[in-house]
C-alpha cells in the first residue's frame, strides 16, 4: 500500500481544507450554472453502479446535491456530506438528500459498514491523502457494497497551461495525479479504473475561466502567487488559446474508479 508520505511525494501540495471549503462556498449559488463537467462526469460514473433497491448511499463531497437528488429519486436513502457549509445549505434548500452533515472525506464521521454505496464525484482531488480518502470510503461501505469515485488526472486543462506558457507565465493550476499513482493509492483494495477525456467549449476565454471559478475550482494549493488576471493578459490569452469551431476549449482527463467491498 502506498504511504501518505509517498502520496505527498507524488503530489507535492498541502491542502488547506478551510480555504477549499471557502472557495466552494463562494461558488455555491452559481455552481449549478457552471457544473457541466460535474454532471457529465457523474453520468459516466453512474454507469458503473450496480443496481439495488432502497440502498443507503453516502454522497461524499456532495456540492449542491445534484447527484444526491439523482440517488434519492431512485428510492435510496441519501446522506450528503461536504466540507462547505454553504454547499450543504444549498443542497438542503433543494431537498437533495435525507441527511446533511459537514465533514471531511479523510475523516468520515460514520461507523464502519454504514452504507451500501459510497459516491464521490470530483471531490477526492481536494484531499491531502488519496490513500487515506479511499480507505475511509471503503471503511464505511458495507460488505458487498461499492465505492464509486471520479477525479481529474494528469494532463487536465492542457489548453490553460499552453496559453499561459505562450504569454510567458506559468499557469495557475493545481497538479493532478496520474493513473499509476491512483492505482498505487488504492493499495490492496479491489479497484478498477476507466479513464477518458472530456472536452468542453466556451464562446471566449473569459467564459472558460469563469467556468473554473464558478465551480469553486480556483483555489490553488500552493497559494495565489500569480495574482489576478489583467485585461492585457486576458487579451493575450484570447489570441493564443486553443479553439475549434465550437469555441475556446477546456479538456479534462478524468477517471471513474470503482472499489468493490468484499
Swiss-Prot record:
Record has Cytoplasm as a keyword: no
UniProt GO molecular function: carboxyl-O-methyltransferase activity; malonyl-CoA methyltransferase activity; S-adenosylmethionine-dependent methyltransferase activity
GO biological process terms held by the UniProt record: biotin biosynthetic process; methylation
Reaction(s) catalysed by this chain's protein: malonyl-[ACP] + S-adenosyl-L-methionine = malonyl-[ACP] methyl ester + S-adenosyl-L-homocysteine
Top-level division of the source organism's lineage: Bacteria
Class of this enzyme: transferase
EC number(s) reported in the record: 2.1.1.197
UniProt entry keywords in alphabetical sequence: Biotin biosynthesis, Methyltransferase, S-adenosyl-L-methionine, Transferase
Pathway: Cofactor biosynthesis; biotin biosynthesis
Functional summary from the UniProt entry: Converts the free carboxyl group of a malonyl-thioester to its methyl ester by transfer of a methyl group from S-adenosyl-L-methionine (SAM). It allows to synthesize pimeloyl-ACP via the fatty acid synthetic pathway.
Family: Belongs to the methyltransferase superfamily.
Protein's name in the database: Malonyl-[acyl-carrier protein] O-methyltransferase
Amino acid at each position: 500500500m502506498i504511504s501518505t508520505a509517498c502520496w505527498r511525494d507524488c503530489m507535492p501540495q498541502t491542502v488547506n481544507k478551510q480555504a477549499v471549503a471557502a472557495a466552494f462556498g463562494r461558488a455555491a449559488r452559481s455552481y449549478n450554472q457552471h457544473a457541466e463537467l460535474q454532471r457529465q462526469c457523474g453520468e459516466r460514473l453512474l454507469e458503473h453502479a450496480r443496481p439495488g433497491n432502497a440502498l443507503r448511499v453516502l454522497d461524499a463531497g456532495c456540492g449542491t446535491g445534484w447527484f444526491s437528488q439523482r440517488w434519492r429519486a431512485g428510492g435510496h436513502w441519501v446522506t450528503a456530506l461536504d466540507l462547505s457549509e454553504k454547499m450543504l445549505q444549498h443542497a438542503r434548500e433543494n431537498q437533495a438528500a435525507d441527511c446533511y452533515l459537514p465533514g471531511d472525506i479523510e475523516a468520515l464521521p460514520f461507523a464502519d459498514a454504514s452504507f451500501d454505496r459510497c459516491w464521490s464525484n470530483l471531490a477526492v482531488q481536494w484531499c491531502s491523502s488519496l490513500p487515506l480518502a479511499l480507505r475511509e470510503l471503503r471503511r464505511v461501505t458495507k460488505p458487498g457494497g461499492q465505492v464509486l469515485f471520479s477525479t481529474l488526472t494528469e494532463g487536465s486543462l492542457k489548453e490553460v497551461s499552453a496559453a499561459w506558457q505562450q504569454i510567458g507565465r506559468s499557469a495557475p493550476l493545481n497538479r493532478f495525479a496520474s493513473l499509476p499513482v491512483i492505482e498505487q493509492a488504492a493499495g490492496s483494495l479491489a479497484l478498477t479504473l476507466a479513464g477518458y477525456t472530456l472536452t468542453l467549449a466556451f464562446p471566449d476565454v473569459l467564459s472558460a475561466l469563469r467556468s473554473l471559478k464558478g465551480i469553486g475550482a480556483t483555489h490553488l494549493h500552493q497559494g495565489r502567487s500569480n495574482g489576478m488576471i489583467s485585461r492585457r493578459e486576458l487579451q493575450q490569452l484570447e489570441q493564443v488559446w486553443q479553439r475549434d469551431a465550437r469555441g475556446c476549449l477546456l479538456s479534462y482527463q478524468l477517471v471513474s474508479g470503482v472499489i468493490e467491498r468484499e
